[in-house]
Amino acid sequence: MRMNKRTLLFVSLVSAAFLGCQIFFGYQDLKSCQDLAEKQRAISEQILASTEQLSVVPWTASAEESESVNQYAVRLGNRLLVLTKGGAHSEVHSKGTSWKLIDQTSTFGGILVSLYGEDGQEVLSKGGSVYLPNQQDALPVLVAEFRRNQEPLVFFGEYKNGKLSNKAGTIYGTSLVFLNTGNEFVPLGIYNSKEECVESLDLPMARAVVFADKENLTTSGSYYMLANEYMQVIVSQESGAIEGINLPFASDREGNKSIVNEIGFDRELAAGSPSEASFPGVQAIDSQRQNVSSVVGGYYPLLRRGTLSDTRKMVSPQYQALNIVSGRELSSPVATGFRVVSFDNKTLVLESGDGGIRKTYTLGEQPYAFDLEIQTTRGQEDLWITSGVPEVEIMSNAFVPAVKYHAVKKNKSDLINVKLPKAKDSLLVRNDASPQWILNSNGYFGVILTPKTPLPTGYASSFIPGNAVPTRLTQLSPKDQAYPASKYPGYTAMLPLPKEAGRYQFMVYAGPLSEPTLKALDRAHTNHKGESPEYVDAIAFRGFFSFITEPFAALLFIIMKFFQFLTGSWGISIILLTIVLKLVLYPLNAWSIRSMRRMQKLSPYIQDIQQKYKREPKRAQMEIMALYKVNKVNPITGCLPLIIQIPFLIAMFDLLKSSFLLRGASFIPGWIDNLTAPDVLFSWETPIWFIGKEFHLLPILLGIVMFAQQKISAIKRSGPVSDQQRQQEAMGTMMALLFTFMFYNFPSGLNIYWLSSMLLGVIQQWATNKILDEKHLQHEVIVNKKR
């Protein structure tokens, strides 16, 4: 019996201890729950206070009914979302305002979600279609959790793989889930806490949200395409930057406004490497969420894309255009794994996975231009925006990349050339300049970045090895290494971003450096003070003698544009330009020819003087000079026409490098298809040293004409040929050969100009010689009276 009492006492004590623990820990749990609830309520109130568009409000079914504390709705601007069981009211009231039913939809468990508005009219999201991210990314959302007899809690959560989570605790109640598109909140769906899944809402405000299905599931490797009549802009979801900018070729097709002509490289790539000439080049999605069909040819790739047939050799995201980079070499992207917030036919909005960066691409009205807005939610130092790497253009057989910026110094604007960095010092950073805009150019095309909001001072440029950003030209005769990647390095231009969080806007021009389009851009961006950004300065090609040739080049182009307007042909305009210059210079040329003719007539007398005074060279020189003087001959005058034409020749050379309108301009189809490239009469497979794989006829014709001119300029000789005359003939022949080799790989436009000039010179030489022969010029020689 005593044993039983002890056992009973022990059991009682254990039970009391257990009950005490239960009460103690229950109290602790209750206190923790109360603390958590208070914390959640405080967070909810803080979020609602900072979110003007979204709020939680009580509602009633009639105006006479007092607002119940357990009936709450979510207000989005002038719309109201109400959760009920059973039927929906045709009208509800909240805070003295009547709300009329717009639409309703049934969800799980008989829950009805009703949409009300003050005017009762339907409304769609302004942001276009909103795409959910791929299944691997978490989407930040705003959640309104409805709990029984309590005001809904509002907190930030994450949506992933159809699931909803809250870092602060478990979600127990039915919840409305909202997506912030930047301009507004749109309903993403309703959360079923029992099944732990989000279901879509069939409501006008929510129909703009598109749930990714299995057939159209986007991945982190997705690309999105914005397009108009001037360009395709291909944006990578992985980097949030531009993978490619493709410019359509000019054609007679209705609606085509492009001024970009197809050239030989484009045709060769389309025929020999169609995979490298495909556009958009990657599997892209348009604003209708349809896959964009790939085509071969028809576009010019402004940016280097690498080798499309080998993903290992495609351009790395760090070198894509309008990327935001940082790091020691300014080559590390600060954000990856972007998601599409909204997407329509003009605007694409992307947000980084961590929500730190939002980028908005908007196609503009101006040709080859679009806008970019970058929104950063937290400050960070040393952020830079990149220009991308332009594709290679061969200008007059040369690779001429350039980085320039436009700035105002001492109330005077100027376009300043940036010294390109080398492989050893691959990064150039300058903090002492304030560019109004910066240009990264390949000669005929360029990317211009213009900040529309204030930025820190400075700019940067970097050298990128050609193997890291291979040009498309490497696919032309790869066995022969006609265009090795290492020979064509890439360059980027960069502008700094402020370290403070905020919105920063840019105007981006990505297209031809053409006078018509850049002038139109200048007019569109001239401010109320009449100040122009002077984008047209970007087409200036500054050679070694630009201070001399620039006025001549401007004059030549004005005359050429006039003749092109009359004839419709740039080739004919070059020939007519040559005729005009010959007419203007005719008096000087005629005087020079007559002077040279007299020099030739004086040659026998000069030889006599040299023979007579061969032991007195000073005396012979004096007699020869006296002979020149009495016959009014200056030995230098024969060179004047050539000297005068040199500035025009160099100006024409520079003009062909700077005038985009001549690029791809055809003169004789099948032979002269591009005035800025050598003519091609025929070609072959195996390259020959210096000649290459193409036969250029124009420089050979030029050499023949120069040789003929030298023969025509020589007078008929009755006596033996002197050593000096033999040397002159040999020199003339060598000059003809030299010009043939020198001009062999020059642009056909330059060869047409020089060939036309030589032909007209031959005609003038022949006519002048004939006239002088008829006048018996040999009797006009006056011999010194004293020898």
Swiss-Prot record:
One of its GO terms (biological process) is protein transport. GO terms for cellular component: plasma membrane. It comes from the Bacteria. It is found in: Cell inner membrane. The chain crosses the membrane at residues 543-563, 565-585, 636-656, 688-708, 735-755. A lipid is attached at residue 21 (N-palmitoyl cysteine). The keyword Nucleotide-binding does not apply. Residues 1-20 form the signal peptide. Pfam families: 60KD_IMP (PF02096). GO terms for molecular function: membrane insertase activity. Keywords: Cell inner membrane, Cell membrane, Chaperone, Lipoprotein, Membrane, Palmitate, Protein transport, Signal, Transmembrane, Transmembrane helix, Transport. It is a multi-pass membrane protein. A lipid is attached at residue 21 (S-diacylglycerol cysteine). PROSITE patterns: PROKAR_LIPOPROTEIN (PS51257). Belongs to the OXA1/ALB3/YidC family. Type 1 subfamily. Required for the insertion and/or proper folding and/or complex formation of integral membrane proteins into the membrane. Involved in integration of membrane proteins that insert both dependently and independently of the Sec translocase complex, as well as at least some lipoproteins. Aids folding of multispanning membrane proteins. Interacts with the Sec translocase complex via SecD. Specifically interacts with transmembrane segments of nascent integral membrane proteins during membrane integration. NCBIfam families: PRK01001.1 (NF002168), yidC_oxa1_cterm (TIGR03592). This is Membrane protein insertase YidC. It comes from Chlamydia muridarum (strain MoPn / Nigg).
